[in-house]
Swiss-Prot record:
It is found in: Secreted. Mammary gland. Secreted in milk. This is Late lactation protein. Pfam families: Lipocalin.
Amino acid sequence: MKVLFFTIALSLFSILHADDVAFSAFTPSEGTYYVQVIAVDKEFPEEEIPRDMSPLTIMYLDDGKMEARFTMKKDDNCEEINIMLEKTADPRKITMNRRLRYTCAAVRTSKQKHWILVCPREFQGETIRMAKLVGPNTDKNPKALEDFYRFIYRERFDKRRIITPKQTEACAPEHA
């Protein structure tokens, strides 16, 4: 009888903790973050998914908004990307504003300072979701990765469309 009780108790415990990864208020600390893994939910051209990623710097501005900065190489030119991040009425979502404005969902993992950002993107008239695991260093945290894979499985992302971008140093734009 005790074995049956413990089996049921452990099953319930694992079920209750299976959803540790939940949409939550996006409240990152200021600092440097790294995109560790990227997944897309539908067919998407490989060349459209970033293969090399520089560190992402998040800063809080005086008006309460956040700014994210990173650099990327495109056609052998370095481009600095600045994105404004604003909280929405739904604390689990943020709007990102650069050229286009779109709303992303934030998912907190079980590891501190590790987030999954899920952003929609229009491509050839279809909405594609892109999920990115973001962490405070280049070392991949096994628990955060486990949370990421559990999340993309739950959200029905295709496991064949997962990319681990190469971490690169930030480049210096010509105008800087």
